[in-house]
Design a protein with these regions (language model features):
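N-terminal export/assembly segments and adjacent metallocofactor-ligating motifs
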Residues: 1-318, 327, 331-332, 358, ...
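Short, glycine-/Ser/Thr-/acidic-enriched flexible segments
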Residues: 28-31, 40-41, 47-50, 63, ...
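N-terminal leader/propeptide and maturation segments of large enzyme subunits in energy/redox metabolism
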Residues: 80-96, 249-364, 463-473, 477, ...
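A glycine-rich phosphate-binding loop feature that marks nucleotide/adenosyl-phosphate handling sites
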Residues: 124, 257-260, 368-369, 385-388, ...
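Extended redox/cofactor-interaction regions of prokaryotic respiratory oxidoreductases
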Residues: 131-209, 235, 317-323, 335, ...
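Glycine/threonine-rich phosphate-binding loop and adjacent beta-strand/alpha-helix elements that clamp
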Residues: 171, 585-614, 625, 630, ...
Length: 965
């Protein structure tokens, strides 16, 4: 260590500086401090002044240095050499002007003729407000990010039920919880903040129960691990609901006032069957919360106006007959009564046979939940006023918290499973209450939000922005993106009768549909930061073949493929045009309230990235690429009235763009107004970037304490949210115990509803799965599988030290994970004749993989699992030939099918029939030992030649004292 007396001390300190920015090594987006000496990155640590991670940093975050030093960096635009196949990495370097001119000419022609022939799909990019705006201005509906492949079931299932969801838009209040139940969550989800919260929760005496097929990461520190079979969480949740209702351990007051539980549903066979009965003599007032519904007053024994503060006499259960009046003689039932009937048969014994959890443990868990919610309830002395004008002196705390993610979502039954979880939380009265689930801005929003997607071909016109958003939240069949014949308008078939509520699109079906020209042919597919030729796809083998598929004339079936990435991934080798992106330490970027911010429970939080070091070579941020293309193509939002360029570059766009002229709402919420003294709303501030940079690159607006809770119904908060542009209306957001939205689709399927109808071959599918109440069904793949031949479930999860496939080129993180194993319960391995550390075959009906196995008691016997995306194609990411990642690493993707047979009509996406969520946790497999004479190398093997632009970088790195050797 240098002492102040050392002559070198002043030189080192004078040349050392610290800059703050936002991490991008996973989706957590922690605040970081980057230490530089002589302009070179020396060290990265957590920023203790950042509200999200409070100085905590993980292995990924501190290893960002080696992201900069990656041998896989792309540094110049590349064009595939004419006559060479995709996948060969046969490129020639071109200038940015050549790249822009090529794209401008091609995209201008598409936009002027048929905008649908351009498709833009992105990975975990954290900039969907910009990419979505670009797609809408272009005029193409064919846009989405990776959510349909990731966790749309979690987002949609909860948003359609309670108006918010886990992760960016809400989470568990572990500061005040007494019991915490985590389901289906791996280490990558909300990583550092969750670790910080869990450590405090455990130290304060909280009880932590983890329900997961695998005991790793978070589960390892749980007080109790309850192993469960994959895809069966819904059955467990329904059994818990059954027990709580049977024992009358529910929050009656909360359900009557803040949910649609007491609302009366029509039972008669008519066009109103299954819908809430409405008074035709009263106005609806608004479509989100109709003011003309009924409840039943059990004291007076008459139907009464539903929307009132006087709810104590409302019946939660019961079936009634309407008296004289517009609905005389009609049979009605409360929504809660329908839920009670739905779960009546969902006993712990029923769930136990499905989940593998003993009935007694299910009963005990229900009692634990109720005990925490009611016996350990408390009050905070916070006065607030509800939406109906009622004054409350305190906020009630229900200290039982949940968290769940992809383990529930990535199944074809995930939407209804997540609905069941949201309803369980609601029965306990935990929604936006201390110790329970709490929203994060910009949520809560209506159920669903008032964002409607393209729903008609007339909204798509040449040289014209879309007439609606490319992505939205359908509320009726009329909101579907289908043509006059009921056929899909979008390439991925999102918002069609196949997957009506696909709020995040179906990125995983884009390549297959484009090659098969189903529903039509496209011209140009642009992919940003999505490794769809490897791990970010359902079946890697088939997709790699499809990317190279040609027609009878020898032309590629996807005529033009553009890939933007910072690194030489497997996907890059298939591109016709490669656009080299910057790293997160080389660019401006923002985590916007308009997109997926990093808000806290107490108020909106957004953040930025600022350049720490200059870009390498000729790298250019994809954000800049979009701004440049939008300006050249003269999109209305990017040009002045006389057709001139409106924004100089991406930073200028972020500062000056407003959602509507004069709205005062832009991408960043902090330091708005001419003097930078306004928050959330205000005129553009030319010095906004500088103000973020001087304030740790983060803006945290702390709301007054009276706005912290009960925000679905908190009059003060709702007024504030509307004024600040977080919501469109001030109406309360009632919890949808019963989803009338789902019933509208079911009515159409049964022919009871006028208007749009599903194609005949999909009627039964829609009628079955669009149950307005949650129910459990086996994953769809099970119906196409001989389960006795494939008795095991196979799943993946991300390790703490790696994210997607981004980190195998990171010299530090490779030392933690250079290859992966298949983890098998010792009993299962013994029965299959497989030794610990031995080579084995994993087979599904769709494919097979040879890999190494390890026995582990931290996995339930019916499941095998591995780390996601550790395996690599030989040569990709500029790893040396024969690297462990290629020779010993493997993917389970080779075992998964993108499509399933659909009776009598061909094939359909292997996805949730409601949301289109990829069902990549549904695959069934069998295992057997590899023969002794087989090569000890994983199968299948593939080769990805390194691009010419990356081959000059060294493959063996030693980083010390600012040097790279």
């Amino acid at each position: 260590l240098l002492t102040p007396e050392d002559p070198q001390h002043s030189r080192v300190t004078d040349s050392t500086e610290i800059k703050t920015t936002t991490c991008y090594m996973c989706a957590c987006r922690c605040g970081i401090r980057v230490h530089l000496r002589d302009g070179e990155i020396r060290y990265i640590d957590g920023n203790p002044e950042h509200p999200l991670n409070q100085g905590v940093i993980c292995a990924k975050g501190s290893s960002g240095i080696m992201k900069q030093k990656s041998p896989a960096r792309l540094t110049r635009p590349l064009r595939r050499i004419a006559g060479r196949d995709r996948g060969e990495s046969a490129f020639e370097e071109i200038s940015w002007e050549e790249a822009f001119s090529l794209l401008e000419k091609r995209l201008a022609h598409i936009r002027a003729t048929d905008p649908k022939r351009f498709a833009l799909f992105t990975g975990r990019d954290q900039m969907q407000a910009l990419t979505g705006l670009f797609a809408r201005q272009f005029g193409t509906p064919n846009y989405a990010a990776h959510g349909g492949f990731c966790s749309v079931n979690m987002a949609a299932g909860m948003i359609y039920t309670i108006g918010g969801s886990f992760w960016e838009f809400g989470g568990p209040d572990l500061e005040r919880a007494k019991l915490f139940v985590m389901l289906g969550t791996a280490e990558d989800h909300h990583s550092n903040p969750m670790k910080v919260a869990l450590s405090k929760f455990k130290r304060s005496g909280g009880r932590f129960i983890s329900i997961n097929p695998i005991r790793t990461g978070y589960s390892a520190i749980a007080d109790e691990w309850i192993p469960i079979r994959p895809g069966t969480d819904g059955a467990l949740l329904l059994a818990l609901i059954h027990e709580l209702i049977r024992d009358d351990r529910i929050d009656h007051e909360f359900l009557k006032k803040f949910s649609n539980s007491p609302d009366l549903v029509c039972l008669d066979d008519s066009t109103e069957k299954g819908l809430f009965l409405r008074d035709p003599q009263r106005e609806a007032v608004n479509e989100d919360l109709p003011q003309n519904k009924y409840a039943w007053d059990q004291v007076r024994n008459v139907p009464v106006q539903r929307e009132t503060d006087q709810t104590e006499h409302f019946a939660l259960t019961g079936e009634f007959v309407m008296p004289a009046g517009p609905h005389h003689g009609k049979r009605v039932v409360t929504a809660f009564e329908l839920l009670r009937r739905e779960v009546e048969a969902c006993t712990p014994e029923w769930a136990g046979s499905i989940t593998g959890i003993s009935p007694s443990r299910i009963r005990l868990l229900a009692k634990e939940l109720a005990h925490a919610a009611f016996e350990q309830a408390f009050e905070l002395p916070i006065a607030w006023t509800d939406a109906w004008g009622g004054h409350h002196d305190a906020v009630i705390g229900r200290p039982v918290a949940f968290h769940a993610m992809r383990g529930l979502a990535a199944h074809s039954n995930g939407f209804q499973t997540v609905r069941a979880l949201a309803i369980l939380m609601s029965l306990l009265g935990t929604i936006d209450r201390p110790g329970g689930f709490r929203h994060k801005a910009p949520y809560p929003r209506q159920t669903p939000p008032r964002v409607r997607n393209v729903s008609d071909e007339t909204q798509i016109k040449p040289n014209t922005p879309l007439g609606a958003a490319p992505l939205g939240f359908p509320a009726r069949p009329e909101d579907l993106c289908v043509d006059a014949n009921g056929q899909p308008i979008r390439l991925d078939k999102a918002f069609s009768w196949e997957h009506p509520l696909s709020a995040h699109g179906l990125m995983h079906n884009v390549i297959t549909n484009a090659v098969h020209q189903d529903p039509y042919a496209i011209d140009t597919l642009m992919i940003f930061m999505a490794n769809m030729a490897w791990n970010s796809t359902m079946n890697t083998t088939s997709i790699r073949a499809l990317l190279n598929a040609k027609d009878a004339e020898g032309n590629f079936k996807i005529p033009f493929l553009v890939v933007c990435d910072a690194f030489d991934s497997e996907m890059v080798s298939f591109a016709d045009l490669v656009l080299p992106d910057t790293t997160y330490l080389e660019r401006h970027d923002c985590m916007s309230i308009l997109d997926r911010p990093i808000s806290e429970f107490d108020g909106p939080v957004d953040a930025v990235r600022v350049p720490i070091v200059p870009p390498q070579g000729e790298c250019k941020p994809f954000q800049e690429v979009l701004i440049e293309l939008a300006s050249r193509l003269k999109f209305p939002a990017f040009t002045t009235a006389d057709g001139g360029r409106k924004f100089k570059d991406y930073p200028d766009f972020i500062v000056h763009y407003e959602t509507a002229p004069g709205s005062g709402i832009g991408f960043l919420s902090g330091w708005r107004g001419p003097n930078g003294d306004q928050s959330l709303r205000g005129e553009p501030n030319p010095k906004q970037w500088e103000m973020y940079a001087s304030n740790n690159c983060v803006h945290h607006y702390e709301m007054p304490i009276e706005h912290h809770y009960m925000r679905n119904w908190n009059r003060g908060y709702m007024k504030f949210a509307k004024e600040m542009g977080l919501r469109q209306k001030e109406d309360p957001i009632q919890i949808a115990i019963y989803s009338e939205i789902l019933q509208h689709f079911r009515q159409s399927a049964s022919g009871q509803r006028p208007g749009r109808q599903p194609p005949d071959h999909l009627r039964s599918r829609v009628a079955t799965y669009f149950n307005p109440l949650p129910f459990w069904y086996a994953p769809l793949e099970y119906g196409a599988t001989a389960l006795a031949d494939y008795p095991l479930n196979a799943v993946t999860q991300r390790p703490m030290a790696m994210y997607h496939s981004w980190d195998s080129q990171n010299a530090w993180l490779r030392q933690i994970h250079s290859h992966n194993y298949l983890f098998i319960n010792p009993i299962t391995a013994k029965n299959a004749g497989i030794e610990d550390g031995g080579w084995l075959w994993v087979e599904s009906q769709w494919g097979k993989v040879r890999c190494m196995g390890r026995t582990s008691e931290a996995v339930e016997p019916g499941t095998v699992w591995t780390w996601n995306a550790i395996g690599k194609s030989d040569g990709a990411w500029h790893l040396q030939s024969g690297a462990d990642e290629a020779r010993k690493g493997f993917l389970l993707n080779h075992l998964i099918s993108e499509e399933l047979p659909l009776e009598g009509t061909g094939r359909i996406s292997n996805s949730d029939p409601i949301t289109g969520q990829a069902g990549w946790y549904d695959v069934r497999v069998r295992i057997r030992p590899a023969a002794g004479d087989e090569p000890e190398i994983t199968y299948p093997q593939s080769h990805t030649p390194s691009t010419t632009a990356a081959t000059s970088a060294p493959t063996e790195l030693a980083y010390f004292a600012g040097s790279l050797k």
